[in-house]
Amino acid sequence: MATKFPKFSQALAQDPATRRIWYGIATAHDLEAHDGMTEENLYQKIFASHFGHLAVIFLWTAGNLFHVAWQGNFEQWVAKPLKVRPIAHSIWDPHFGESALKAFSKGNTYPVNIAFSGVYQWWYTIGFRTNQELYLGSVGLLLLSCALLFAGWLHLQPKFRPSLSWFKNNESRLNHHLSGLMGVSSLAWTGHLVHVALPASRGVHVGWDNFLTTPPHPAGLTPFFTGNWTVYAQNPDSPSHVYGTSEGAGTRILTFLGGFHPQTQSLWLSDIAHHQLAIAFVFIIAGHMYRTNFGIGHNMKEILDAHRPPGGRLGAGHVGLFETITNSLHIQLGLALACLGVATSLTAQHMYALTPYAYLSKDFTTEAALYTHHQYIAGFLMVGAFAHGAIFFVRDYDPELNKNNVLARMLEHKEAIISHLSWASLFLGFHVLGLYIHNDTVVAFGQPEKQILFEPLFAEYIQAASGKAVYNFNVLLSSSTNPATIAGNQVWLPGWLEAINNSKTDLFLKIGPGDFLVHHAIALGLHVTTLILVKGALDARGSKLMPDKKDFGYSFPCDGPGRGGTCDISAWDAFYLAMFWMLNTIGWVTFYWHWKHMTIWGGNPGQFDESSNYIMGWLRDYLWLNSSPLINGYNPFGMNNLSVWAWMFLFGHLIWATGFMFLISWRGYWQELIETLVWAHERTPLANLIRWRDKPVALSIVQARLVGLVHFAVGYILTYAAFVIASTSGKFA
């Protein structure tokens, strides 16, 4: 007899109802809950899956390289990066009629999809110039992908499975990850930038055929070994340097110029190389700090145990944290996701403000798409961090081990933490909404001069301190007599000051009352999301209603007062509610970024400054005005090359709206629905020939909410993606 799905749970496999399938899918990745799972086996399975994850990433990147080389126009784009629109891939679609074939055809090619991912600018900056190089890169990544898949398989074989003690050897792991993963990889990337990318930016091709015979600097390695390192920073590219050619090119490879290359409006490659080298140096040193084989260096347990507050009135400090974190994968994952979430959000900010890739800042749609993309990813990562923090408290937290330490004390005064967050959220919410509504009311009644408009003085002061001259604050870097200004004048400051005060760059945009209001609206969203997540995690193990619910698990729903009021203590429900707040908060962030930039790019920043002070301005002058290209993508009179985005805009709305059917429901409703469907199925000719072995039962409350949430999130993001791309490329094609 064939084993029923899921093999990892005997109890589920024997369930006679359809919940066997849904619970099987839901718990497929909950490895620690599988039958016969030991701690060692759990670590080994997760370790092996990392190789699979990396293989998928490299396979995906290989696909990008391959399709651009095969169907793109990379070489034409390299010749004229500001005139040619980059092609992602061809479109072969039987639905295309004559007008669509024309609309989606560029330069006598077959219909194509335009690339808004920034890969052209990235590959160009790091030294790619021909399709053949793209093909080679693709094949290389494909081979690497295969090697990683093999490595994943190999590490599941009995002889090659690492032991549990190997996984829990924190010092060795830290040393290897810091030195190897971060340090050596940064050093390798510095090498690539210096040996391949920089010469390419100066018109010198370096490939597999000549990389050993083409030194990146005319002085070779002599200055390195003689300690005369300043030679590498002499003779810079001139301001008139034509990127990708030797015209105006210098020879320096490691610099501290500050600002941007005048032609490409991207960071100087030699500055990036210098930065990457510094990171490599710091991390390689850091990777030699922890005590392993030689009995020297730091010991993590000693460091944590030594962190006890003086005076003894603040408890046991970090005692117990070493064992707690070492033995809990959930808290490790939570910390990693939180760090990665912050890094991803910072990437979104720096990708446009300090553009690293040549000509990226001239491709407005790509810039907008990359910002939106990275902010949404950051949101999901951050919510995931808190979700795993809550699971840690349910599954892994040991009150005895953590007695009176920082974790225990945080739990003991959680009411204070939650109430303070609540007060901050209430203050922000009432004041921000009150200001917006006041402004809407006076504008509606014909007295716009009575709006309450705050000048963001503190933010302007910070911008001025960083060198922004427009506010006339004369402080720190915007003061010519300040010691900081004098100190930096010989090195990076002239380039930086030129960049920060140049109206063509995105570095510290001029701000006003509209920015002040939306900043506080975003702060409201962040604080409420944090409140929900923090409360969900701190109450995950128990609350006033249920002092300890360790055996209750993590993913039970808030189900109203009928079952004893589980809304107070459901960590899963907190995660679920926080997802909506996270999505809406990032909506405010991306709306703000996109609208402000649309007005700057269009040469009319005054539109944002005037209309962003009241809600109707946002609805009318941002959403409605910019959705016109989408609404007119196709109509009774024909279509244009935005029609696919227009259709996706509609499709996204439909997915989003479908979510509400699952969100506004309860378990009895689902049971009735499924039984009605079964009844109809069994009485319909032909359909009743098909039977299923499992008895159909309703979705659980958690499952229905998850289905609703997925529709809400996917529909929401698809809708906004289509809006950003079509509205920006429609205006700035």
From Swiss-Prot:
Membrane topology category: Multi-pass membrane protein
Location in or out of the cell: Plastid, Chloroplast thylakoid membrane
Reaction(s) catalysed (UniProt annotation): reduced [plastocyanin] + hnu + oxidized [2Fe-2S]-[ferredoxin] = oxidized [plastocyanin] + reduced [2Fe-2S]-[ferredoxin]
Keywords: 4Fe-4S, Chlorophyll, Chloroplast, Chromophore, Electron transport, Iron, Iron-sulfur, Magnesium, Membrane, Metal-binding, Oxidoreductase, Photosynthesis, Photosystem I, Plastid, Thylakoid, Transmembrane, Transmembrane helix, Transport
Gene Ontology cellular component terms for the protein in this record: chloroplast thylakoid membrane; photosystem I
Binding site for [4Fe-4S] cluster: C558, C567
MF terms in GO: 4 iron, 4 sulfur cluster binding; chlorophyll binding; electron transfer activity; magnesium ion binding; oxidoreductase activity
Keyword Iron-sulfur applies: yes
Binding site for phylloquinone: W670
Enzyme Commission numbers on file: 1.97.1.12
GO annotation terms (biological process): photosynthesis
Binding site for chlorophyll a B3: M661, Y669
Cofactor binding note from Swiss-Prot or TrEMBL: P700 is a chlorophyll a/chlorophyll a' dimer, A0 is one or more chlorophyll a, A1 is one or both phylloquinones and FX is a shared 4Fe-4S iron-sulfur center.
Family of this protein: Belongs to the PsaA/PsaB family.
Function: PsaA and PsaB bind P700, the primary electron donor of photosystem I (PSI), as well as the electron acceptors A0, A1 and FX. PSI is a plastocyanin/cytochrome c6-ferredoxin oxidoreductase, converting photonic excitation into a charge separation, which transfers an electron from the donor P700 chlorophyll pair to the spectroscopically characterized acceptors A0, A1, FX, FA and FB in turn. Oxidized P700 is reduced on the lumenal side of the thylakoid membrane by plastocyanin or cytochrome c6.
UniProt subunit comment: The PsaA/B heterodimer binds the P700 chlorophyll special pair and subsequent electron acceptors. PSI consists of a core antenna complex that captures photons, and an electron transfer chain that converts photonic excitation into a charge separation. The eukaryotic PSI reaction center is composed of at least 11 subunits.
Name of the featured protein: Photosystem I P700 chlorophyll a apoprotein A2
Gene this chain is encoded by: psaB
